[in-house]
């Protein structure tokens, strides 16, 4: 079966778990996919306030005097800085899962209404946010798909900020191939799940 997803207004079904009405944004700089992914997550939780790409980027620790000096993008630990800087969020990340995660982990967070930010080798290094998962109604995982909010949505003739990826295929490419040192959270299966702290 092939699906045409209705994007923002999609609702969960027997096979599809989706964050309905997740709003997307397009990054305004080549380097800002990480902070734009964070912006979308903040918006999802109605916590955006006056934050923007520049103000969120300023919350990241400096990479000066490290092997990544001059790198404008966002490492895992810098993405964590963003949510710690905004405040009021609990964070689960690949730092908590040294053996990695798999499809059922992602489905679990989505079913709790939590978007999953990921950093992988798309475009040679890119942050996106998984907002949906479709089993396609089969027992096999090899036809499952992720729906992502993509701040660099330039390749499908519809720059609406949504994309679809074969889930298993993405998981086997879920790496930055050593681009980030362990001191910055490493390079493999980089993900971040932020959710509002219980009050």
Regions found by a protein language model. Name each.
Residues 1-5:
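Short, small-residue-biased leader/transition segments that mark boundaries at the very start
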Residues 9, 52, 77, 84, ...:
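Detector for Asparagine
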Residues 10, 133-199:
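Noncatalytic regulatory segments and standalone regulatory/sensor domains
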Residues 11-97, 180-181, 185-189, 194-198:
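Cysteine-nucleophile protease catalytic domains, especially the papain-like/related folds used
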Residues 57-60, 80, 103-107, 171:
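Generic detector of well-ordered alpha-helical segments enriched in charged/polar residues
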Residues 63-66, 123, 160:
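Peptidoglycan cell-wall recognition and remodeling modules
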Residues 95-151:
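Active-site-adjacent substructure of cysteine-protease-like catalytic cores
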């Amino acid at each position: 079966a092939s699906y045409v997803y209705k994007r923002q207004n999609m609702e969960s079904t027997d096979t599809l778990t989706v964050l309905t009405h997740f709003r997307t944004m397009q990054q305004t700089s080549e380097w800002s996919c990480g902070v734009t992914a964070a912006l979308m997550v903040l918006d999802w939780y109605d916590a955006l306030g006056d934050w923007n790409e520049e103000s969120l980027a300023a919350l990241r620790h400096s990479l000066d005097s490290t092997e990544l000096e001059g790198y404008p993008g966002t490492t895992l630990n810098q993405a964590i800085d963003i949510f710690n800087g905004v405040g009021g969020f609990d964070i689960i990340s690949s730092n908590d899962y040294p053996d990695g995660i798999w499809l059922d982990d992602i489905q679990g967070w989505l079913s709790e209404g939590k978007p999953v930010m990921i950093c992988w080798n798309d475009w040679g290094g890119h942050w996106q946010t998984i907002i949906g998962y479709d089993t396609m109604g089969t027992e096999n995982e090899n036809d499952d798909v992720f729906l992502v909010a993509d701040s660099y949505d330039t390749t499908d003739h519809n720059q609406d900020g949504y994309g679809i990826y074969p889930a298993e295929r993405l998981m086997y490419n879920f790496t930055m191939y050593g681009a980030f040192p362990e001191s910055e959270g490493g390079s493999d299966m980089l993900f971040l799940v932020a959710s509002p702290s219980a009050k």
